């Protein structure tokens, strides 16, 4: 093309590597679910609870996230396919509580699992001011759990896999 500026295309070549600014998805689900998954993993490690110990789970999300992975809640609590599961905060949270994370095989193992689907019904989603303030730069979440009558909360501003919170080699 005429009028192009080759200097714009080569500025920083060999010095600036834009791939270092890309995020990597550690879980096979909608990126909006990842901060909540991270928060649940952290709470499980800290509190050592099982699904039987849970009285309540509420995932606080931005409005954008709620519209993608939270609403309509009844549909999100009853995913019928892998894609439904990928875009269901209740399902992703239930699997994380049951298995300690979320991997591809979890869809096969949990989509028709009565215990997992029953746990989905305990999981609520709600608007969260802190998550909203971080959106759209970060896909944040606040996880609130009630374990054996005690309330706990974890806010994850930057989910794993973002350049500012990149995964460790073992992850």
Predicted regions and their residues:
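Terminal-appendage/accessory-domain detector
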Residues: 1-171
């Amino acid at each position: 093309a005429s009028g192009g500026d080759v200097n714009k295309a080569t500025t920083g070549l060999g010095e600036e590597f834009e791939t270092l600014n890309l995020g990597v998805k550690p879980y096979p689900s909608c990126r909006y679910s990842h901060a909540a998954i991270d928060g649940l993993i952290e709470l499980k490690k800290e509190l050592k609870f099982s699904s039987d110990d849970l009285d309540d789970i509420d995932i606080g999300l931005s409005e954008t996230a709620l519209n993608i992975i939270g609403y309509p809640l009844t549909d999100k609590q009853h995913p019928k396919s892998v894609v439904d599961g990928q875009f269901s905060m209740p399902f992703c949270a239930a699997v994380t509580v049951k298995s300690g994370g979320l991997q591809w095989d979890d869809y096969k193992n949990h989509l028709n699992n009565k215990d997992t689907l029953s746990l989905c019904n305990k999981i609520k989603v709600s608007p969260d001011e802190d998550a909203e303030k971080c959106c759209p730069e970060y896909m944040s979440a606040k996880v609130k759990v009630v374990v054996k009558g005690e309330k706990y909360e974890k806010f994850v501003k930057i989910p794993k896999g973002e350049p500012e919170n990149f995964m460790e080699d073992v992850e």
